[in-house]
Design a protein with these regions (language model features):
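Extended, charged catalytic domains and RNA/DNA-binding interfaces, predominantly
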Residues: 5-9, 15-569
Length: 569
């Protein structure tokens, strides 16, 4: 009897060892509640695994035909080239997180090399820029990105007539806690791919952006339980934590030392656009800085406005020649005269009433509480008071977390609150006073003889987080094409929720000082609602005198550009 028990225990232990070391047959993993099919073994390589581009280019006759067609259609010596100025790979913190196996739509790592292959062979762009988040770079990843674009350019053929031109830059991902200290996200682009003509390290923002928080301390690590629940992919989960540790170990740069004199392996940041511009000037390399996603309420605080940014300290017309009007995160072009909240004559924030074009989220907060209250059988007058209180409580929140004043709310309860109804694919929770039209209409008359104003050329981009440059050419495969992501299923959502403090639905609202975004973790952002308003990305078009790097860059500097919603128009 003891011998049989011993054999059974040995077999069981052996089974567990095989299971937890990813050596058991696939059917054995089906007993685990978090199991999902992975026939392609998509997570074999991690974002830390070195990758190389495909060592080939498009046939010469394809490039010749493309050039001749565009020259003929334009009737000009210039041709229209299409590209993507905003591409993230899994070298970005949020993209790495979205690629984890327990996220729906995920299918493994998308390193910088994939961006070249996708842009060259799938979307067949003429140029692209890598722009991973500066806040989540390690020195190795910055150098990996540079080498990737150099590989892409080395296989492009004649530099005067390449099949594609690869550029590099980074995203300065600033997010303010309130409208007064919010400047927003900007892409910093460089002309050259020679490491000696590029900063030795990116310059990050100072703020509370997702990419910033995600990872520069050990607190950004994922729980070890993920690898136990999904042992087939434990190495991938572990690689995320290894990467977080590398970032946490990167020392902060000395702010008193000029940027070019700093060691390459330190973390440098700039709090404002003006500080960023000064640091870029210290390097002296040709660059363009492009604001983007300006109206996107996923991170933009209530009442955000271009006004506080339009001053001599934070404007550089030589750098900010372009602006991104459209991406997979939505349209930021159009101004509409509505507001998230408004201030009365006593200085109190109040909730505006709905219009035919716009349902304020604060108003819908009142409707949600009203419906819950009535459903419990309370008196109508009491429920009306609770509804009014809910609207008031919502607008007292100066950050993006107003929705948390409605405890336990679901995306469905909010309907289309926060979305303008007569704008083409508007960004989520639209902030109209950060729109491109509003910015162009403004002037600063501090110096009446030389007023300040913005003068932008328009570009579109994807803002893809899976290295799929120019993915808007076909509106298909939404989960893999767009950035719509989230936990894979209810089991994994339960795992995520187990470490967060989530409020239960109640028929009364919470005051601003009663919400706790930090404890809510990922649930402190309206990820599910945001996903409903994501789409495939846009494109940047340039009127260039040739296909080469100089011609493309010169067209961008001249503002001979336009943006599309993804198609070659």
């Amino acid at each position: 009897m003891l011998k049989k028990i011993s054999i059974a225990v040995t077999i069981f232990v052996l089974f567990l060892v095989l299971l937890m070391t990813n050596k058991a047959p696939d059917f054995a993993y089906r007993i685990l509640p978090g199991y999902f099919a992975d026939p392609d073994k998509a997570w074999t390589d991690t974002p830390l695994t070195p990758a190389s581009i495909t060592q080939s280019r498009l046939p010469e006759d394809v490039i010749r035909s493309r050039t001749e067609t565009r020259l003929h259609s334009s009737g000009s010596s210039k041709q229209i080239l299409f590209g993507d100025t905003h591409i993230h790979t899994t070298n970005s913190a949020d993209a790495f997180m979205y690629s984890l196996p327990m996220m729906h739509g995920a299918s493994g790592a998308y390193p910088p090399a994939f961006a070249c292959d996708y842009a060259r062979f799938i979307s067949q762009l003429d140029f692209y820029f890598l722009t991973d988040h500066a806040e989540s770079f390690t020195l190795g990843q910055w150098q990996d990105g540079i080498e990737s674009v150099r590989q892409c350019n080395r296989t492009a053929g004649d530099p005067k007539n390449p099949d594609i031109v690869a550029f590099i830059g980074w995203e300065w991902t600033q997010v303010g806690t309130t409208a007064e200290n919010h400047y927003g996200h900007h892409n910093v682009l460089f002309k050259d791919d020679d490491p000696t003509m590029l900063p030795s390290h990116p310059i990050a923002s100072v703020g509370v952006g997702v990419a910033t928080i995600a990872a520069r301390s050990s607190e950004g690590k994922q729980s070890g339980i993920l690898g136990l629940l999904d042992p087939r992919h434990q190495d991938y989960y572990a690689s995320y934590n290894t990467w977080v540790e590398k970032m946490a170990q990167t020392p902060v740069c000395d702010s008193e030392i000029a940027s070019p004199l700093l060691p390459a392996n330190c973390y440098e940041s700039a709090a404002t656009p003006g500080e960023l511009f000064k640091k870029l000037d210290q390097w002296g390399f040709d660059n363009i800085v492009i604001p983007h996603g300006t109206t996107w309420g996923f991170y933009t605080p209530p009442n955000a406005d271009w006004r506080h940014q339009l001053n001599k300290d934070n404007i550089d017309p030589e750098k900010t020649r372009l602006i991104e009007v459209y991406s997979g995160h939505g349209n930021s072009e159009v101004f509409r005269d509505f507001t998230v909240r408004k201030m009365d004559i006593t200085g109190d924030w109040t909730c505006p009433e709905p219009t035919y074009n716009y349902l304020p989220a604060c108003w819908q907060a009142g409707e949600i509480i009203l419906n819950r209250c009535l459903a419990e059988g309370n008196e109508a007058i009491e429920c009306a008071k609770r509804s009014s209180d809910a609207r008031y409580n919502f607008v007292q929140v100066d950050t993006i977390h107003g929705f948390m004043t409605v405890p336990g709310s679901t995306p469905e309860e909010w309907l289309d609150a926060g979305q303008p109804r007569d704008i083409f694919l508007p960004s989520f929770n639209y902030k109209p006073r950060k729109s491109v039209q509003y910015g162009l209409a403004m002037q600063n008359f501090d110096d009446p003889d030389d007023p300040l104003r913005y003068r932008w050329g328009f570009v579109g981009s994807t803002d893809t987080h899976s290295a799929r440059a120019g993915n808007g050419f076909k509106q298909a495969h939404r989960l893999s094409t767009t950035d719509a992501t989230g936990v894979r299923d209810s089991f994994w959502e339960t795992i995520f929720a187990s470490t967060a403090v989530i409020t239960e639905p109640e028929p009364t609202s919470l005051k601003a000082d009663q919400i706790d975004p930090a404890s809510a973790k990922i649930f402190a952002s309206e990820f599910e609602r945001t996903n409903s308003f994501l789409s495939a990305g846009g494109l940047a078009a340039v009127h260039a005198s040739g296909r080469d790097r100089d011609a493309i860059w010169s067209a961008m500097k001249r503002r001979e550009v336009y943006g599309t919603s993804g198609h070659r128009i």
